């Protein structure tokens, strides 16, 4: 199921800039294997969910998966063929702002070959280049 915040303080947000590297969420905390972002990007809730589903499908019953990013930024879209002005568009979907170094998914309880394949399948769903990371 697509994730988005239950409630937010404001309906709309500025786009902002993605400068520098990730200073938080860049170490493996829960699992043994992880997928790490190498470039900055907005990752949509759909992409996060697609990656999670791909990993759980491949790992079957074995292993545990942690999703380390959450889509908390609303992206507004204006209706097509609308003239300029008359305010900002309405929130259409949610994204997670990801900087280089950020851990996207973590996994444990499976062999390294299974984890590597599952994480590579999830990586193919991501809009950015990523790398497979192991603790230790």
UniProtKB/Swiss-Prot annotation:
One GO biological process term: mitochondrial translation
Matches recorded under PROSITE patterns: RIBOSOMAL_L16_1 (PS00586), RIBOSOMAL_L16_2 (PS00701)
Presence of keyword Ribosomal protein: yes
Keywords: Chloroplast, Plastid, Ribonucleoprotein, Ribosomal protein
Gene3D superfamilies: Ribosomal protein L10e/L16
One Pfam family matching this protein: Ribosomal_L16
InterPro entries associated with the record: Ribosomal_uL16 (IPR047873), Ribosomal_uL16_bact-type (IPR000114), Ribosomal_uL16_CS (IPR020798), Ribosomal_uL16_dom (IPR016180), Ribosomal_uL16_sf (IPR036920)
Gene Ontology, cellular component aspect: chloroplast; mitochondrial large ribosomal subunit
Localization terms from the record: Plastid, Chloroplast
A GO term, aspect molecular function: rRNA binding
Complex formation: Part of the 50S ribosomal subunit.
Protein name per Swiss-Prot or TrEMBL: Large ribosomal subunit protein uL16c
Name of encoding gene: rpl16
């Amino acid at each position: 199921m697509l994730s988005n915040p239950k409630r937010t303080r404001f309906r709309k947000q500025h786009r902002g800039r993605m400068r520098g590297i990730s200073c938080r969420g860049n170490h493996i905390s829960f699992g043994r294997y992880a997928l790490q972002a190498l470039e900055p990007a907005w990752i949509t809730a759909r992409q996060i969910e697609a990656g999670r589903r791909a990993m759980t499908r491949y790992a079957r019953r074995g292993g545990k998966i942690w999703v380390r990013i959450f889509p908390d930024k609303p992206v507004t879209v204006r209706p097509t063929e609308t003239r300029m002005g008359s305010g900002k568009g309405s929130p259409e979907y949610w994204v997670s702002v990801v900087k280089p170094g950020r851990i996207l998914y973590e996994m444990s309880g499976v062999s390294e070959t299974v984890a590597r394949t599952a994480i590579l399948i999830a990586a193919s769903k991501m809009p950015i280049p990523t790398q497979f990371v192991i603790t230790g």
